[in-house]
């Protein structure tokens, strides 16, 4: 016989009745990242990052330390987080309520003001203090540093380029036009007044401005009497004055563009003057054009970001020295083993490592071809494979001598690098000419630098050793893995701020969040193993 059991196990409640827990943290899981975050923050003196303003009027200010905790935790959990999203989380997520500790939910503008006014100058010190605690707890090895760089698209309009070479070329055209105009002025107007303007090969803005003022005063021109439009005929003096004024404005524009580019760049964006146009791997427009971007450099130690830097250079070679100098300023020493890919292996960087006691574990340009292409490595027509006679002269595969011709300096080299130029005594009638130098119409010449060749041999020995193989493997995992997490896992592919200072602020916040989350993950793995 079936019994009709109508027992109601639901409690009697109403949805509209207010019922809150006495302690919010009891609802948060014990393995939640917020507890690891609070552990790190409790060991850092946050008050020293903020200067007391001493306001005596107006509403009480929001607690800057709580706001900083909320911002850092948002970057820790999400990688990159908009200010409006942070405000939304503070209203709906009990973990952010726990961090605010009863404070009224701040608006997105409040977070923006704190980042802009307080963190711009102190964010790097905050990053160092976070790393100091994490590195001490996790026993991070700062002697083995894995270096890599990536290009991140700037928050600039895509078609706002300014090319330095175009400005230089067009400025020269303006110089030529000014010379022609001065000839016309001297011939048609100033000659009758007994005055003659001097021509030059290049015209400074101040000189052209002085000419314009002198022309106006000498000819007695009054700009209020200038005519324009249909039915009016301009005088010769007005035409020449307006033409020279136009050239002056163009010279000012070119001078500003060239000065903004500086000596180390060839382009910049009109909407972000610190961004440089570079070729990115992510060509989403499909037209193979350059995009405004920054070169992000990171030094990784035991999976943590130890140092981060931003440079406007498209090449990684020029970024190595500034990154190592920043590492030294931060930690008080240089890493013993800086490991990097072939983009960093230059003569200057190798000598820099020697000067500062660092081992050479950076690949050079032809490293992969040298180690994997046996045909290239054993090619008898390469100069490094040439034999030598008793006098030390190089001998080609046909036994002909290469005679020393001269020593020449390599341009743009900080350490005064030189290379030796050798020329074959005679390539006439050589049976190996087609394989040795098919394009040469004269005797073959080769350029060699014995010091650089010796450095490459040392690098090969270092990288092909067991220790070097482990370092190469770890570099691929740690440095490239870091950018993989940021770009793909966190979907961070374009900057949100403009200007180099603001870009460094944004990337340092992301690095703080990355290290905090990495520390939490390692801590959880150790807990599970235990």
Task: Write out the residue ranges for each language-model feature.
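A short glycine/serine-rich beta->alpha loop
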Residues: 54-60, 96, 497-499
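A ubiquitous short alpha-helical element
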Residues: 5-8, 54-58, 467-470
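Basic, short loop/linker segments at the boundary and entry of helix-turn-helix/winged-helix-like folds
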Residues: 29-75, 448
């Amino acid at each position: 016989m079936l019994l009709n059991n109508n027992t109601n196990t639901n409690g009697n409640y109403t949805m509209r009745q207010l019922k809150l827990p006495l302690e919010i943290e009891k609802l948060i899981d014990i393995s939640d990242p917020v507890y690891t975050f609070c552990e790190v923050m409790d060991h850092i003196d946050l008050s020293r990052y903020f200067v007391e303003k001493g306001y005596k009027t107006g509403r009480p200010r929001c607690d800057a330390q709580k706001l900083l905790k909320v911002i850092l935790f948002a970057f820790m959990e999400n990688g990159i987080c908009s200010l409006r999203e942070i405000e939304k989380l503070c209203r709906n997520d009990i973990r952010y309520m726990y961090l605010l500790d009863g404070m009224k939910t701040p608006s997105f503008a409040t977070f923006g003001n704190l980042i802009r006014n307080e963190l711009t100058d102190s964010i790097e010190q905050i990053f160092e203090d976070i790393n100091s605690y994490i590195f001490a707890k996790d026993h991070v090895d700062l002697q083995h540093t894995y270096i890599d760089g990536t290009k991140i698209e700037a928050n600039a309009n895509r078609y706002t380029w300014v090319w330095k070479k175009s400005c230089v070329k067009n400025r020269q055209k303006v110089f030529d036009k000014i010379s022609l105009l001065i000839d016309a002025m001297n011939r048609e107007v100033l000659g009758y007044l007994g005055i003659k303007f001097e021509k030059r090969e290049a015209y400074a803005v101040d000189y052209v401005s002085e000419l314009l003022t002198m022309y106006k005063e000498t000819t007695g021109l009054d700009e209020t009497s200038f005519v324009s439009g249909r039915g009016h005929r301009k005088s010769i003096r007005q035409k020449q004055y307006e033409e020279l004024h136009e050239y002056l404005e163009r010279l000012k524009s070119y001078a500003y563009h060239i000065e903004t580019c500086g000596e180390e760049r060839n382009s910049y964006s009109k909407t972000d003057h610190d961004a440089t146009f570079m070729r990115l791997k992510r060509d989403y427009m499909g037209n193979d054009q350059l995009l405004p971007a920054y070169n992000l450099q990171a030094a990784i130690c035991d999976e943590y970001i130890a140092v981060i830097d931003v440079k406007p250079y498209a090449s990684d070679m020029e970024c190595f020295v500034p990154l190592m100098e920043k590492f030294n300023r931060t930690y008080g020493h240089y890493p013993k083993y800086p490991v990097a890919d072939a983009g960093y292996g230059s003569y200057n960087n190798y000598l820099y490592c020697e000067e500062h006691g660092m081992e050479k574990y950076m690949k050079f340009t032809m490293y992969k071809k040298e180690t994997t292409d046996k045909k290239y490595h054993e090619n008898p027509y390469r100069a490094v494979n040439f034999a030598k006679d008793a006098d030390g002269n190089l001998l080609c595969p046909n036994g002909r001598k290469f005679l020393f011709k001269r020593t020449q300096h390599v341009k743009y080299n900080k350490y005064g690098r030189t290379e030796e130029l050798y020329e074959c005594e005679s390539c006439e009638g050589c049976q190996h000419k087609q394989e040795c130098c098919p394009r040469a119409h004269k005797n073959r010449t080769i350029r060699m630098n014995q010091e650089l060749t010796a450095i490459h041999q040392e690098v090969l020995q270092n990288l092909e050793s067991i220790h070097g193989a482990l370092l190469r493997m770890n570099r691929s995992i740690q440095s490239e893995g870091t950018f993989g997490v940021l770009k793909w896992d966190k979907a961070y592919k374009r900057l949100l701020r403009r200007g180099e200072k603001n870009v460094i602020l944004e990337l340092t916040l992301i690095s703080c969040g990355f290290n905090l989350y990495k520390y939490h993950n390692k801590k959880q793995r150790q807990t599970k193993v235990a």
